């Protein structure tokens, strides 16, 4: 798998195999194996922005914490496909982790202000459930960014909005308890 594919893109068959391997490694929390696999695929399929997006998202996981490298891959994914909302979210997270808080908040806000149906059914959409999760996670992260920027009232508003829109059985990268802990910290500020 060392040679670059002429088109730089995966075939549908390769894409399915890739997705299956990716999901398997994720379910095992095998981040080292996942990073190794993604880097191999990135060399072979340099035009597949999703590979770079997944690399970035994996590299800023707490147990991996390779933030500068995550930023590099998120930036590359954005250059290839700047309109994919998951790319925008991953890029905003990477910006946050390298300390570019203003820019990070700008990108989270871009997702928050976007119409849910545009996210759900646009070119890169995966349905309303996915769109809700992406928007809610962006609201949560906007709260975190504002808290770090000492914009406490805005942070409170974001966390309250997150809690108000979180539905039972709705997937999120964050829990209600995490949002409540942030609000508890903010009550004294």
Predicted regions, residues:
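Structural motif corresponding to the intra-repeat A-B loop/turn of tetratricopeptide repeats
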Residues: 28, 62-64, 98, 149
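TPR-repeat structural position
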Residues: 31, 65-67, 101, 152
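Canonical positions in the second alpha-helix
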Residues: 40-41, 76-77, 111, 162
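TPR alpha-solenoid repeat register
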Residues: 51, 87, 120-121, 138, ...
């Amino acid at each position: 798998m060392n040679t670059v594919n002429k088109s730089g893109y995966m075939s549908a068959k390769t894409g399915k195999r890739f997705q299956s391997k990716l999901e398997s490694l994720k379910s095992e929390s095998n981040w080292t194996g996942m990073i190794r696999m993604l880097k191999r695929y990135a060399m072979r399929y340099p035009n597949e922005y999703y590979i770079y997006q997944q690399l970035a998202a994996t590299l800023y996981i707490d147990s991996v914490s390779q933030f500068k490298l995550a930023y590099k891959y998120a930036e590359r994914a954005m250059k290839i496909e700047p309109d994919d909302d998951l790319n925008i979210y991953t890029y905003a997270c990477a910006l946050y982790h390298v300390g570019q808080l203003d820019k990070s908040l700008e990108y989270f806000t871009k997702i928050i202000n976007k119409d849910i149906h545009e996210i759900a059914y646009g070119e890169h959409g995966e349905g309303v459930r996915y769109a809700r999760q992406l928007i809610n996670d962006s609201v949560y992260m906007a709260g975190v960014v504002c808290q770090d920027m000492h914009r406490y009232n805005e942070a409170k508003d974001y966390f309250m909005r997150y809690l108000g829109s979180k539905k039972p059985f709705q997937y999120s990268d964050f829990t209600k308890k995490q949002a409540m802990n942030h609000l508890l910290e903010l009550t004294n500020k």
